Amino acid sequence: MNDTVSRYLKIYEEKRKEIEERLKEFKDMLQKSDEDVFAELCFCLCTPQTRARAADAAISSMRAKNLLLNGNKDDIAAILKKNGVRFPESKAGYIVAARAYLKSLKNLPSNAFEARERLIKNIKGLGYKEASHFLRNVGYEGLAILDRHILRGMKEVGIIEEVPKALTKRTYLKLEKKFVQFAKDLGMSPEALDLVMWADKTGEVFK
């Protein structure tokens, strides 16, 4: 067995309770307020090329100052920049524009793939990775969040030969199938495997 695979299985065994609790939190997210769900979307809009903790801190700061729903682009960009979120001006614009969909985020199709396509079509700043991340964080199942950590992990275990330089829709969907099958082979859900691989790279179960 590949050393990396052994490590993943060990992490899953050691952190299984924590992982299951986190997945339950995701499942319960759509029962929360519209602002809570919108905050999760904004977190995912902020994550490209930015540490998850930095993005999370920025969202928390905006909510504390009542800016997430009401702040202008400049106010939001300033907080993003202060917290180390890359491309703050662009992402601030995405957050302001996404407010138009605040009330519709709880009414997406129940099918994860249909929900993802709708998000990508309608919300500027969301690609396959970001839309998958949001949907996983509000309880959807069966999607892969193919960020650089996950892709490097896939290379380590031999699922892919190289980390692609760019992810077209076709490439994303092809690699997603491989990731989902790999999770199944390990006896995990794709959602659990994602958290395991993140814990392997960062030492913590986050989101």
Task: Label each PLM-derived region with a short phrase.
Residues 1-28, 92, 99, 110-116, ...:
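C-terminal accessory module of base-excision DNA glycosylases/AP lyases that mediates lesion recognition
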Residues 1-84:
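Structure-specific DNA junction-binding interface
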Residues 36-44, 56, 89-96, 132, ...:
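Non-catalytic, well-ordered alpha-helical scaffold segments
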Residues 46-54, 66-67, 103, 142, ...:
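Short alpha-helix boundary/capping elements
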